[in-house]
């Protein structure tokens, strides 16, 4: 699970424009990512629910290498290089757009707009589970090796697991994928009987889909034959010496190197990769970077490969100016510029947009004691009242220009999911200020529309404000938002206005994405837990199995506001230990009713690329809508 800004996810197409531009494409279907389908009967790929189209590569098309430029999201530039990512750096921008280019995850889990494991982009065959799903055997993919010629082995995976253990021992915040009592705490043993095989024995049964696609996909093997040392001049430790004490030294050394951003391009550690690219340039001020092909890359890719240059921008407007001036090869289309999509086409770009698999949300802080907010937000009726003042359809129409889909719980209504619960198919708390007012009045609040509501009837009775809320408490608190996103800014401004009509007095405070995920995400930022009541930095990207494990379970590694509910914990635990597909649906149904966050509509994430840029498979463009960047498939037309 990775956090993301919604800054460029606020990309939409006016309904009128959909009709006008539909003539530019013909219908078809995706070929299924990793399959390297280079042609078909249709000249374009048209994905249901998406906007725009993706031209298919012409048979026999000439391909040449050069440098292809790609636009980064303003304010969300990469700032971490080590494949084991701390919570403070846990974003799709560090993981999918930067680190994964050089160090591939064990399992690649996005196939264009289809959430599934892509076998030939994964470093191992899918695990074989046995012993009641308590043992799994992993066979490494022999196609992959390190850029210095050394083989990629099971020992590299074992080394990475031992490194993660050392990181967690120093601080649970050192690995964003960690939740106490779960991986790697639940490992009874990890052994490598031969160079290509790793056997993991767990202390309890797991859901195989979840463990493969949520947990193991978060593990990027690291080169043990070169990185298993505690200093630049130190000897590389053999596997027999990967003791906790020795691994503590390795962790300290590699982490110190990762913090030295000024040496990213000169440190020889970062040149040993198994992914398609090596870092060649990195701007410590802007985060812009350039990567060159790893000529020994064993995964699927175009031949020849081009350099990949990530360009930094200070604002959406600056980025779109680059599109208009044709100075960027692959760029996003900000929501404010959607009416100009016909112009973008005339400039010589293709475009495609689709919602991603994750969720957009406004987070509540269940630990903020300021003005008794922790007690207020702990009341389910109040969270439901907040849902009633969220105008999802209005946001889709006004801010997404019609190209968005509502989401009423952790599993959005679109893209379609077989796990969608019945209570999330339609809005259980439709926009209605009067409904919010009725809920507040029914629970002991004196409503002052346009002003600030006051708790009149203190207590924990059915018609009272709730436990821990004294009489005279005002409904008054702050909301910190990612002001780099015009979409978030518009949504939060509208939310504050609608809430005010119900006497809920919210003060907006602006911030930026990187600062927010580093300073306001509990449980690893406790010093700031009384500095925010609500926050909206964007959202998160789900795996193919949409459990909210680590996000909404008590003590979860990606907990943002410390929501804790024994019933939710029970259902989430069932989702990750049972093979019953109904388990995760039951989890989502409960959370849709409980509203641990304010769930927001999903909007299309739209990208444009020059017609002079091709791809050997359409999924490489679809991947962008899911925050994954796969430039190893892109090429310059010859």
Q: Across the structure, where does each feature detected by a protein language model lie?
A:
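Surface-exposed binding/hinge segments that line
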Residues: 177-254
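N-terminal lobe/hinge region of extracytoplasmic solute-binding protein
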Residues: 68-131, 272
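Long beta-strand-rich cores associated with HINT superfamily self-processing modules
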Residues: 609-638
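Append "and occasionally in soluble cytosolic enzymes with long acidic Gly/Pro-rich linkers
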Residues: 290-295, 377-496
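Extracellular/periplasmic solute-recognition and catalytic clefts
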Residues: 164-177, 191, 280-296, 309-374, ...
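Gly/Pro-rich hinge or "lid" segments in bacterial periplasmic/extracellular proteins
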Residues: 111, 219-300, 438
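Aromatic- and charge-enriched surface segment that lines or borders ligand/interaction sites
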Residues: 125-172, 193, 199-201, 319-322, ...
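Periplasmic binding protein-like
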Residues: 70, 149, 323-324, 328-332, ...
